[in-house]
Amino acid sequence: HALHDEFLKLNHFKKILNHKQMVLNKEIKPSKFCFISKALHEDSKELYSFFRKYFDPYLFYFSQKNLEEKIPNILVYKENQKIRAALIYTQTLNANFLDFIAVDRNLKHKNVAFALLNHYFAANTQNKFFKLFVEEKNQKAINFYKRAGFCFNHINLKFYRNF
């Protein structure tokens, strides 16, 4: 650990964020909501702009082209044909990772974030392991995930910058 800290100091790295992993620790009975749908290829430009509003460009690691390839793993909520909430996930052989979720304020439906999360669970019933990373200071997100049945494990993802 001391060697790691020395390397960071010598190379002028500063810790900018610490994300902690959370895993779903309960059986779920997901429900689908009629106002949530899968993203379409023609949504990709709008999705890219939508997520860039909410996430630092250093953290939102999808290019517009990458996002187009992720379309089958993106869920959206639209009002007046505009994307107002979305969730991106990744499937692996034994787990599902929630990559990003963002929800506009003042929506017609008040439970859109919960509905997106439930749709994500329902779309991935073949896989029982659900994981995500959350910024350790984002108490609103942490509380939301805890209410959904997620809990912290011991894995941290630290972000550093030297510029």
Residue ranges and their predicted role:
Residues 103, 109-122, 142-147:
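Conserved acetyl-CoA-binding loop-helix of GNAT-fold acetyltransferases
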Residues 127-129:
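Short, high-confidence coil segments that cap the C-terminus of an alpha-helix
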Residues 17-18, 84-85, 113, 154:
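A structural microfeature
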Residues 19, 29-58:
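Short amphipathic alpha-helix that is part of the acyltransferase structural core
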Residues 39, 101-103, 134:
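Hydrophobic adenine-recognition pocket in adenosine-nucleotide-binding enzymes
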Residues 1-33, 156-161:
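Acyl-donor-binding surface of acyltransferase catalytic domains
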